[in-house]
Amino acid sequence: MQVTIECQKRPEGSKPNTLRRQGLIPAALYGHKGTESISLIIKEKDAQLLLKKASVNNTLVDVNIPDVPWSGKALIREVQTHPWKRFVYHLSFFSVAAHGKIDVVVPLNLVGESSGVKQGGIIEQVITEISVQCLPESIPETIEIDISPLKIGDSISVGDLQLSEGVTYLDDPTQTILTVMAPKKGSATEEETAEASA
């Protein structure tokens, strides 16, 4: 997915609350020259649109800064929001243009219908995303898990995942992702089965 954000260099001495009243969101870009950072501002409406398309620590974003001699791709590292209102207070980007492999978080997507579920079992999913390491151009949008073969009592762990070439998981390989649990005694499914066999 191609995602772009237009930024400007933040004026020196500008106050965050003053910028927000003007419809501008303070932001920072890290890693473009080692540890050096650039203070930026982004239009609030552009920031809201960006967050609808991009995910934190997952989506590569083309960051355009017309008044700075830099252009490249970055990850959204952090989004600061108002404690109870839905206002974005600050965005942090991390440049990946000059880096090798990076650590990102990728959501897990279950596909298929488990044979265990067809028998009345229940999918109990413990984690919905994992941390992986890969090159910026190899970041997967999601990792699909085919649950079709799973019977009641079967489970899938991080180490069971089939990842693309060049993508490695960072989480504990023994970490359980999901388990097909047997239906609880007296559940509607068991009662229906008993009635059908009566």
UniProtKB/Swiss-Prot annotation:
InterPro entries: Rbsml_bL25/Gln-tRNA_synth_N (IPR020056), Ribosomal_bL25/Gln-tRNA_synth (IPR011035), Ribosomal_bL25_b-dom (IPR020057), Ribosomal_bL25_C (IPR037121), Ribosomal_bL25_long (IPR001021), Ribosomal_L25_dom (IPR029751), Ribosomal_uL5_bac-type (IPR020930). Keywords: Ribonucleoprotein, Ribosomal protein, RNA-binding, rRNA-binding. GO terms for cellular component: cytosolic large ribosomal subunit. GO terms for molecular function: 5S rRNA binding; structural constituent of ribosome. SUPFAM superfamilies: Ribosomal protein L25-like (SSF50715). Pfam families: Ribosomal_L25p, Ribosomal_TL5_C. Transmembrane segments: none annotated. One of its GO terms (biological process) is translation. This is one of the proteins that binds to the 5S RNA in the ribosome where it forms part of the central protuberance. Belongs to the bacterial ribosomal protein bL25 family. CTC subfamily. Part of the 50S ribosomal subunit; part of the 5S rRNA/L5/L18/L25 subcomplex. Contacts the 5S rRNA. Binds to the 5S rRNA independently of L5 and L18. This is Large ribosomal subunit protein bL25. It comes from Gloeothece citriformis (strain PCC 7424).
